[in-house]
């Protein structure tokens, strides 16, 4: 309870309400109860944003019918960004791993056998992989499955090892809808973008807000996806359609239960 009170007082400090007691029956208690189920960083960030707005427009406080509902507009904006970035990361990782599997198989596998990952060049990475995942052998595994077991850090190492094979993918002249895509002409240039994405990915997957500017992050992911021959617009459209379908089925199911 002490922690809830501490956070609640911090939220009130950021909001800097002229008359907090006026919201006693207008969302203030609901706000306090929500602390135990909402994301701390996003809740604090939302309260800071609302506090700044109320300082800029003091009369706005009198127009708030429910403090909790009003604050949730700012909170939900942050969680929606988190979910959107999570989806971008999923698209990027999936496309990158699959494209790498195809290129490495074409360039370095034996004829009719997908065995590029058995190269001595990758022995350290493979032995570490087997140890982490408790694998005695890689019999029955193909390149797609192997790359799905590797971390993004190991993918970075593999791309560096085989940069001559991957450079055309990221550096060659390429257009999309008659627009020339920016190129990542050197390993260092690619690494800068990749490291940016990797850092944000780790933050998001550990349920933390990314400190990297969203516009910069999305821009780099979108460019890389298009260079990987992945159309993010189609993917987002299809995903949203699926979400709507799932939501509709859930509503129907709930209706049957009542």
What spans do the regions from the language model cover?
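Extended intrinsically disordered or low-complexity regions, especially N/C-terminal cytosolic tails and loops
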Residues: 1-191, 196, 214-258
